[in-house]
A protein has these predicted regions:
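Hydrophobic, aromatic-lined core segments that form the binding pocket/scaffold
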Residues: 65-70
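A structural signal for short, well-ordered beta-strand segments and their strand-loop junctions
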Residues: 180-184, 224-225
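Broad gene-expression machinery/nucleic-acid interaction feature
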Residues: 85-87, 178, 287
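Short acidic, glycine/tyrosine-flanked loop/strand segments centered on an H-E-D-like triad
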Residues: 74-99
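Short, surface-exposed beta-edge/turn micro-motifs
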Residues: 177-180, 244-246
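Alpha-helical scaffold segments that mediate packing/assembly in large oligomeric complexes
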Residues: 92-177, 185-199, 313-314
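Sequence/fold signature of self-assembling virion shell proteins
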Residues: 2-61, 75-82, 145-154, 198-314
């Protein structure tokens, strides 16, 4: 009997895989800093960008002279996708009860719950990358302390000035004006009541500070609040994924075909993933099992396209 290769031995359910691939968790913000780029291989080179767009080239050409050439984008470092697999379980009791109740799609429910768990893992992984101060040059990061923190309302802290400093640092390093701000939930809570912010919006006719108002105030396309939390193994303590950090960045959707554009980061995702294998019945557990697999890796493509604010609040 011939040996089966991995592609032949795994039976994929295309309908359930489409459910997994279409899943979007409303509370996760990692994709704003690390937009997904589908790749055909599990490993390759991270596409990085240099200063070619900003150089003054002598494009003049004398008769018979060779035309000058310009290359854009280059490989710097390697990426390797990691596989993550979990199985969603649907006891037959749930299916039996569902037959006599409302039309609940238990398969989709199980897959989406698994996807939510995996999305939280990716969110934490991306946040750890984005909030690692060691990845940034000294001009692209700051740590706020004492009365400079945005939770201090004594008149010293100036969040708008800090954001402007961050935006200028990114523009000076990349030529791109930041379009995205991601902040932890505690930071957003402090900004909603900050006197400087309240004073700036008092003429807008709005009484409540929203992310849309902050985006307009900071002059960026979008402000996103990372509200995700994770628990310890015992489930007795919970921690904010994005903590007290703020990341100001330029991000852009791209593809491998056009090599994207100078951007803060990407999430490399294997073509066709996430996928759901054909469900099977576990007699011992008396349950239907739905295996879900993802192959992905968030990478920081250009730290100079970002600015990290640490301990923005106390």
């Amino acid at each position: 009997m011939p040996l089966l290769n991995p592609a032949a031995s795994r039976v994929i359910d295309p309908v359930l895989s489409s459910v997994a691939q279409g899943y979007k968790h409303p509370g996760m913000v990692a994709s704003a800093l690390f937009p997904q780029v589908n790749v055909p291989l599990r490993g390759g080179k991270i596409i990085t960008f240099g200063k070619e767009d900003f150089m003054l080239y002598n494009a003049g050409r004398a008769p018979g002279e060779n035309t000058k050439r310009v290359s854009f984008g280059y490989s710097a470092g390697d990426y390797a996708l990691s596989d993550y697999s979990l199985e969603g379980t649907v006891p037959i009791e749930n299916l039996q009860e569902g037959l006599n109740g409302p039309g609940i799609d238990h398969a989709a429910l199980a897959i989406n719950r698994v996807q939510a768990i995996m999305a939280l893992r990716l969110e934490k992984q991306a946040a750890d990358i984005a909030c690692a101060a060691g990845s940034y040059a000294s001009a692209n990061k700051t740590t706020l302390t004492s009365t400079a923190q945005w939770s201090d309302y004594t008149g010293v802290s100036q969040p708008t000035r800090v954001i402007e400093t961050a935006k200028e640092a990114v523009r000076a390093a990349t030529g791109k004006v930041p379009n995205t701000i991601v902040m932890g939930a505690k930071v957003f809570s402090a900004l909603k009541n900050h006197p400087v912010i309240i004073d700036r919006i008092k003429y807008t006719g709005r009484d409540v500070v929203t992310v849309e108002l902050l985006a307009a105030l900071f002059d960026v396309q979008r402000v996103l609040v990372g509200g995700a939390i994770y628990s310890n193994d015992a489930g007795t303590a919970f921690t904010d994924v994005w903590g007290k950090f703020v990341v100001v960045a330029y991000t852009e959707l791209g593809s491998v075909a056009d090599m994207g554009a100078p951007s803060y980061g990407y999430t490399y995702n294997l073509n066709g993933y996430p996928l759901v294998e054909e469900p099977y019945y576990d007699r011992n557990a008396k349950s239907w099992i739905y295996p879900v697999t993802r192959a992905e890796a968030p990478v920081l493509a250009s730290a100079s396209a970002g600015y990290l604010i640490t301990t923005a609040v106390a």
